[in-house]
Amino acid sequence: MSRYIFFSGKGGVGKTTMAVATAVYHAMKGEKILIISTDPASNLGDIFEKRIGHAITPIMPNLSAMDIDPDAATEEYREKVIGPMRGIMPDDIMKVLEEQFRSACTVEIAAFDRFTDFLVNDEFDLIVFDTAPTGHTIRLLELPVDWSKHIEESAKGSGQTCIGPVSSIQGAKEKYDRAIAAMRDASRTEFKLVLKPEKTSLAETLRAHDELSTLGIRNFSIIVNGIYPNDEIARSRYANLSTMQVRYLGAIEKALPYPTINVLLQSGEIKGPQAIKDFAGIVFDGKNGVVDSRIKESMRYDNFADGTALADILQKKYNSKMVIITGKGGVGKTITACAVAAYLAGDWHETLLVTTDPAAHIGYVLDEPVGATIARTKALPHLSAVRIDQKTAVGTYKEKIIADAVRSGYSADMLIVLKEELESPCTEEMAVFEEFSHLTENSDFDYIVFDTAPTGHTLRLLELPYDYARQVEMMVNIKKDNDFASDAKKKLETLVKKLKDSDHCTFLLVIYPEYTPIQEAKRTMDDLALAGIHVQGIIADNVLEIDESTPDFFRRRYGMQQHYLGIAEKTFRLPIFRIPMFDDEIIGLPTLKEVSESLFQRECCPERSGYNPNTKEIML
């Protein structure tokens, strides 16, 4: 009977690295291992230095890997459900079925359905799940419960779900029930919570722990990753970070009293078979040694774009402008979004800062609560903030759909079916998108800055207009007087036009100057380009600075960064802006101002009185 290990944690804490090291370690012990990534922006292949796709791929003796590709999973799922009906059902019925299975609902359930296949699989001794960042991992793990309940309730009612009749997916309910039982079985399943000794990472881990516990999951262990070597950092300009980490290590021990492994930050990247094996030995067997950088020489990178160029990029010809910040989990998107918003608000522009990430952190950076309704921040008079809250968005979305259906003349029976479909788990995805779309229409602000979820999920959010456009077209064709569908179609067309218009919307990619974030950002840029959306700038975060007293550990990491900054320039061929590594956490306006000033290379948020050039008001 297979055992399972799930890795969960905030983006950028090293989940994939720790999952890979765990899989390799057990494989070297002679166990038959499969590692699976459920992250839409998987980087398993980057770490193994081998192409991995939507099929089980041999990596080394006893170890195979697989990336669950949402598109491939959707096609497989669609064919599994409607394939047997071909040649039996009339062509016009098949056309309707095929359209129904091109919905956003199908995309969500298909990837999740493939994931649950492995929770009822006994072919391997151990299956390691490298999951997406926590907000989306929680969503994935809730789905077996949600879908099982939805199928059960639909069977009692109309017998219909948003992805077809209950009769065609009843067998799935049994599989989902077995998956739920496997996840809750502490003798078979372990959840490793990976975090860094930092405020946002600890807060998100505690939230994940609580939510997983409510799902009936009990078997936890902790990996604290990215700890600086004390003797090295104490002699550097970043000595304050060591004091901060010691403080959080104590807090982690008290808040999460589970078996814990502390892992030192290495001076080189964990990439390639030998580096992974060496790292696994250091972490799990306590072997002496470090994983050093394979980059021995590098040219100093001096081609950062001037901050005024970033200010110019943000200037658009429309009154209401959008700025969308995206990138790999943990590269500093939230801090960058807050810094950009602070600069704009400090320059007298009415600015709205929005987070679409389920694990919202803008409140931690601003050091004040950010709720589900738009509110002015205390820190800056021209800055407002809001987070898209899934539960609130779902409630609002359901009420709106039902009200529109009533106005469109739906019968009582049709409303019953609609209400059942709205209980579908995929309603949450639609509701979040609807709220995102609604915020882009807000004309009260000069700028709307979006702090998005990690790249795979941001791309999914930005694909939704195209998915829903197909569904709306079908709704309009089916019921010509459907006001809701007609209105939705117009809104979708407007949103897609805005996203593609570089005079209206600015896309900025955030990277660390390391291999994996650069590769993921390049894939994101290419995917966006296919949708007609063009990235306009790259922001390199956590860039090290050195001087005569810098110890070897930081010199080696500095050399690695300089090498990858050169690669980033050739890869993106876009202006690269710089945020240096700071010696403390970015929490509150004083440190946020420092970030903004380093990025834009000018004073941020000055205390001003006098003439406002944007509104032509006299401020006293």
Give residue spans per PLM region:
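Short, ordered loop/turn segments at secondary-structure junctions
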Residues: 38-41, 70, 196, 225-227, ...
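Short amphipathic alpha-helical segment that frequently serves as the phosphate-/nucleotide-binding helix
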Residues: 16-21, 202, 206, 334-338, ...
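Walker A/P-loop nucleotide-binding motif
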Residues: 11, 329-330
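Conserved catalytic-core segments centered on acid/base and nucleophilic motifs
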Residues: 26, 33, 201, 212, ...
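Nucleotide-state-sensitive switch-loop elements of NTP-binding domains
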Residues: 1-13, 18-180, 320, 336, ...
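C-terminal lobe/tail of nucleotide-utilizing enzymes
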Residues: 180, 184-323, 369, 500-508, ...
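Hydrophobic anchor at the beta1->P-loop junction of P-loop NTPases
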Residues: 7, 325-327
